């Protein structure tokens, strides 16, 4: 069960309620309430627990409103059924006399056609009899039912408007803002939907403080993405925002994590693009996808296009192994990036589109693309201070024994990448559990209590994990990255 599932179910419940499908809405509301109840058992933070309890109460109020609407509609159905039964029981003899109704003001009908007939020109004989009362018009059951239906619809509209107001009052943990829709005229609908799926509308929930070290990279990304929206009058002319940033470094150093932090912190539309997004088996569609991607980014600006492993899309041109279709895609990507819409083409820097790229093979990237990615920064292996900070971030949810010395562990991790350090922490956190279940049967393992499983991690566990987990980056690779960044870097 995830928070994303709760959010989607709340959205579906409200949509069904607004559309009048109250049975389906109640199913989703009940499911959301059950999901939140289960989630509350896993929340240990008191403040967060109170917030989610408040969310549960507000959603429960919505569900009660929907139940009241369903009861009201059910009562209307019963009334209409009894009215039809009474209509069938009315006598149909011509001899009975109806009482005169209350006069009702009626609007004149536009241009009624008169029937010319000699049969009904003479009045009926019984209308001239003394004491006889002419049968008056009696409102039919059908008209009463239509009036009642209008009342039901007006009440439903009031409930819908009330539901919208309550939706606006709910916390941001559940509600989502509605965005403008991109006009897909001239493009294949499937292509537009494929790119819209790559827009990260949900929060990746990675903050700047979740990333250890990499201070210079954080400052550069904030300068390239955040500051132009805060100070648009400053970032004009030669100070226009950077159109492209390339992150270069060994695997596991935090390049993709920095991109997630940009999507979380910078409040821009974030496109997560890979090689599968921009390739198609049909001739010419890959180039259309590239152009459509940038047009959508300009529409949803300010926007950030993150291309992970960009060397797989835009490798060096002119090689013997290059295919014609691949060359056309690279050409379209280069053309679109040169007109991405910085201050040189758009007077408002807050409507910028920035390309953020990451690669482990910078030497394979095309020279023209390297020129368009104006900032080329090196994401190195973490320093001793960064390794210790990363250990604290990875172990903040674990209970550590008193003998654990993080500084000593960080010193023993020289040459480890961020991903390697995370693997060491994960392996060390499982050591106590492995010792506890050693020699037990599956039935005995299932009967273990929670306290027995959650034992503190000791220094010995980290020493054993370091022996099992080796570093994944060689010294020769580091030397090659440093040589490239000295020659082509732009920090």
Curated annotation (Swiss-Prot):
Gene3D superfamilies from the UniProt entry: 1.10.8.60, P-loop containing nucleotide triphosphate hydrolases, Phosphotransferase system, lactose/cellobiose-type IIA subunit
Annotated positions of the Phosphoserine modification: 42
Region span, Disordered: 87-183
A molecular function GO annotation: microtubule binding
Protein's GO biological process: cell division; cytoplasmic microtubule organization; microtubule bundle formation; microtubule severing; negative regulation of neuron projection development; neuron migration; protein localization
InterPro entries documented for this protein: AAA+_ATPase, AAA_lid_3, ATPase_AAA_core, ATPase_AAA_CS, KATNA1, KATNA1_MIT, KTNA1_AAA_dom, MT-severing_AAA_ATPase
Means of activity regulation: ATPase activity is stimulated by microtubules, which promote homooligomerization. ATP-dependent microtubule severing is stimulated by interaction with KATNB1.
UniProt xrefs under SMART domains: AAA
Keyword annotations of the record: ATP-binding, Cell cycle, Cell division, Cytoplasm, Cytoskeleton, Isomerase, Microtubule, Mitosis, Nucleotide-binding, Phosphoprotein, Ubl conjugation
Any one GO CC term of the record: axon
UniProt PTM comment: Phosphorylation by DYRK2 triggers ubiquitination and subsequent degradation.
Ranges for region Interaction with dynein and NDEL1: 1-75
Chain segments carrying region Interaction with KATNB1: 1-29
Region called Interaction with microtubules, residue ranges: 1-185
Primary role: Catalytic subunit of a complex which severs microtubules in an ATP-dependent manner. Microtubule severing may promote rapid reorganization of cellular microtubule arrays and the release of microtubules from the centrosome following nucleation. Microtubule release from the mitotic spindle poles may allow depolymerization of the microtubule end proximal to the spindle pole, leading to poleward microtubule flux and poleward motion of chromosome. Microtubule release within the cell body of neurons may be required for their transport into neuronal processes by microtubule-dependent motor proteins.
Assembly with partners or alone: Can homooligomerize into hexameric rings, which may be promoted by interaction with microtubules. Interacts with KATNB1, which may serve as a targeting subunit. Interacts with ASPM; the katanin complex formation KATNA1:KATNB1 is required for the association of ASPM. Interacts with dynein and NDEL1. Associates with the E3 ligase complex containing DYRK2, EDD/UBR5, DDB1 and DCAF1 proteins (EDVP complex). Interacts with KLHL42 (via the kelch domains). Interacts with CUL3; the interaction is enhanced by KLHL42. Interacts with KATNB1 and KATNBL1.
Protein name: Katanin p60 ATPase-containing subunit A1
Source organism of the structure: Rattus norvegicus (Rat)
């Amino acid at each position: 069960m995830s928070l994303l599932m709760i959010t989607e179910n709340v959205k579906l419940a409200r949509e069904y309620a607004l559309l009048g499908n109250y049975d389906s809405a109640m199913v989703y509301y009940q499911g959301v309430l059950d999901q939140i109840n289960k989630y509350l058992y896993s929340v240990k933070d008191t403040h967060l627990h109170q917030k989610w309890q408040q969310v549960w109460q507000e959603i429960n109020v919505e569900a009660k409103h929907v139940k009241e609407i369903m009861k009201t509609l059910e009562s209307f159905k019963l009334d209409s059924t009894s009215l039809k039964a009474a209509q069938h029981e009315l006598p149909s003899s011509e001899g009975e006399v109806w009482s005169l109704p209350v006069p009702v003001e009626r609007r004149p009908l536009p241009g009624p056609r008169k029937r010319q007939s000699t049969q009904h020109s003479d009045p009926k004989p019984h209308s001239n009899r003394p004491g006889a009362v002419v049968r008056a018009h009696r409102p039919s059951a059908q008209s009463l039912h239509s009036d009642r239906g209008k009342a039901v619809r007006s009440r439903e509209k009031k409930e819908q408007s009330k539901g919208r107001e309550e939706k606006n009052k709910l916390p941001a943990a559940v509600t989502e803002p509605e965005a403008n829709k991109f006009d897909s005229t001239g493009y294949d609908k499937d292509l537009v939907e494929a790119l819209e799926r790559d827009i990260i509308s949900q929060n990746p929930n990675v903050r700047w403080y979740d990333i250890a070290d990499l201070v210079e990279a954080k400052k550069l990304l904030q300068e390239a993405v955040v500051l132009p929206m805060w100070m648009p009058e400053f970032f004009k002319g030669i100070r226009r925002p950077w159109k492209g940033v390339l992150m270069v470094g060994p695997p596991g150093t935090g390049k993709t994590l920095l991109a997630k932090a940009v999507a979380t912190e910078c409040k821009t539309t974030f496109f997560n693009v890979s090689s599968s997004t921009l390739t198609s088996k049909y001739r010419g569609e890959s180039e259309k996808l590239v152009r459509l991607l940038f047009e959508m980014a300009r529409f949803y600006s300010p926007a950030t296009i993150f291309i992970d492993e960009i060397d797989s899309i835009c490798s060096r041109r002119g090689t013997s192994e290059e295919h014609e279709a691949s060359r056309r895609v690279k050409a379209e990507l280069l053309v679109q990036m040169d007109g991405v819409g910085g201050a040189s083409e758009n007077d408002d820097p807050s409507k910028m589109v920035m390309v953020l790229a990451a690669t482990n093979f910078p030497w394979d990237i095309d020279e023209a693309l390297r020129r368009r990615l104006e900032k080329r920064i090196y994401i190195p292996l973490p320093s001793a201070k960064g390794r210790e900070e990363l250990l604290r971030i990875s172990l903040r949810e674990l209970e550590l024994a008193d003998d654990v010395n993080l500084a000593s562990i960080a010193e023993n991790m020289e040459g480890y990448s961020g991903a390697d350090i995370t693997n060491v922490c994960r392996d060390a956190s499982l050591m106590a559990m492995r010792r506890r279940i050693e020699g037990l049967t599956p039935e005995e393992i299932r009967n273990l209590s929670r306290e027995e499983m959650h034992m503190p991690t000791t220094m010995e566990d980290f020493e054993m994990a370091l022996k099992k987990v080796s570093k994944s980056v060689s010294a020769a690779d580091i030397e090659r990255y440093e040589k490239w960044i000295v020659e082509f870097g732009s920090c």
